[in-house]
A protein has these predicted regions:
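C-terminal binding/interaction regions
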Residues: 71, 115, 119-120, 133-163, ...
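Histidine- and/or cysteine-centered catalytic micro-motif in compact active-site loops
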Residues: 68, 122, 236, 244-247
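Active-site loops and adjacent core secondary-structure elements that bind or stabilize anionic groups
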Residues: 1-197, 212-230
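Gly-rich Lys/Arg/Thr-decorated short loops/hinges at beta-loop-alpha junctions or inter-strand turns
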Residues: 22-34, 107-113, 187-206, 283-305, ...
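Glycine- and Gly-Pro-enriched alpha-helical subdomains that act as flexible
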Residues: 71-110, 240-342
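Alpha-helix N-cap/helix-initiation motif
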Residues: 35, 39, 212, 245, ...
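Flexible, glycine/charged-enriched surface loops at secondary-structure junctions
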Residues: 56-64, 162-165, 228-235, 265-276, ...
Length: 390
């Protein structure tokens, strides 16, 4: 197939809309549904991300995309009992690719509502069954088992978007886009992110475990496909906070750090002990948890309101309890798509348990940034590579 025609572009008034190749066939096939313009943008960006993660780590990878940025990305590592609980994972053994997607979606379940899923490996029954219970717009993968395809074709009254990508496809060396009738050209960003980029450790502490290296790679690869400016927090092979599309670096660091804090607070014993009413929908449960751990907790705990969500009225999770729980976070990695201009980014990252930093370096205040990292015994690598994405 040489072209596809979505119903419209980014908005319903933007017609006509078309996807095409200058030469040859499109490297993808729509197996079910009718993806829209933004769906395809999410699909192609997310596929590049998971493909790069698989290449860099050798592990199955998955991503959950919304509006051309990842809400989460993860590697296919086993789920702990706590993770199974907070991500609503089914009991029993799960395939690595299913674990990857469950973790990717679990990074920020509110932002993943209505997501586009991407898998580095063939979609299997485990992954399809989990997706079937979630609110999602579509999926891209290099293949599907018969069982998975049957499950996915039954989602959204048969309209769920399923796209298969040719894993051998390599884009042209020059990419083009038009803005306001003017054509822009640039070289395709084929930068290979690997462990060689992590060799320039500029802090006094230079100890990097393999897990820390993998987390740095995950952070950097996620940033490569996130709208800039962006900062990404990672722990144990999954993103836990992505701050995308901000105009200042510190706002990226704060936004992503706040998301990381929320991810960690979802594991607080009080949250794990919440007793929800029977047959509550997953999105309603996600929203209730998000409000419960926020400063607006009365919105779900007020008399006459909590009964709609909980069997038993929960105790308030106090500010002191939240601060004490967040203070226990450790072993977190943060990556930045451009240099940290001031040490304040390191100070904010530390509050969310950051121990490892990967950033390009190159600020006129690098000495201040390094000194701040040294103050907390952090390990910081200067990659020398900027990762802007627009």
């Amino acid at each position: 197939m040489k072209e596809l025609e979505p119903k419209y572009g980014c908005n319903p008034n933007q017609k006509p809309a078309r996807l095409s190749m200058d030469q040859g066939e499109l490297p993808l096939e729509v197996l079910n549904g009718r993806p829209g313009y933004i769906n395809f943008m999410d699909a192609l960006n997310s596929w590049q991300l998971v493909r790069a993660l698989k290449k860099a780590t050798g592990l199955p990878a998955a991503a959950s995309f919304k509006h051309v940025s990842p809400a989460g990305a993860a590697l296919g590592l086993p789920l702990s009992d706590v993770e199974r609980h907070i991500y609503f994972a089914p009991e029993g053994e799960l395939s690595p690719i299913a674990c990857a997607y469950i973790r990717a979606r679990g990074a920020d379940r509110l932002c993943s509502f209505g997501d586009w899923a991407a898998l580095s490996d063939v979609c299997d029954g485990d992954t399809a069954r989990f997706l079937a219970a979630e609110v999602s717009d579509g999926i891209i993968a290099p293949g599907y088992t018969d069982e998975a395809l049957e499950i996915l074709r039954g989602k959204r009254k048969g309209g769920y978007n399923v796209v298969e990508i040719d894993p051998s496809y390599t884009p042209a060396p020059i990419e083009r886009r038009s803005i306001f009738g003017i054509t822009f050209e640039q070289g395709y960003n084929d930068l290979d992110i690997n462990e060689e980029m992590l060799q320039n450790v500029v802090t006094e502490n230079k100890e990097l475990s393999q897990q820390a290296k993998n987390d740095m790679l995950l952070s950097l690869i996620t940033l490569k496909y996130t709208q800039s400016n962006s900062v990404c927090y990672v722990k144990n092979g999954m993103t836990i906070g992505v701050g995308a599309g901000q105009q200042s670096r510190i706002h990226c660091t704060r936004l992503a750090g706040n998301k990381a804090d929320i991810w960690w607070l979802r594991q607080h014993p009080k949250v794990l002990g919440l007793q929800f009413v029977d047959k509550i929908r997953r999105p309603d449960r996600d929203n209730a948890i998000d409000i419960y751990i926020s400063d607006e907790h009365d919105d779900v705990l007020a008399e006459g309101v909590w009964q709609n969500t909980f069997k038993v009225k929960p105790e308030v999770l106090t500010a002191e309890e939240k601060a004490a729980w967040i203070a226990q976070m450790s072993g977190v990695t943060v990556g930045s798509d451009a240099f940290f201009p001031f040490g304040d980014n390191v100070e904010r990252a530390r509050k969310s348990g950051v121990q490892y930093i990967a950033q390009p370096g190159g600020s006129i205040r690098d000495d201040q940034v390094i000194a701040t990292a040294n103050k907390y015994g952090m390990v910081m690598a200067f990659t020398g590579i900027r990762l802007f994405h627009h």
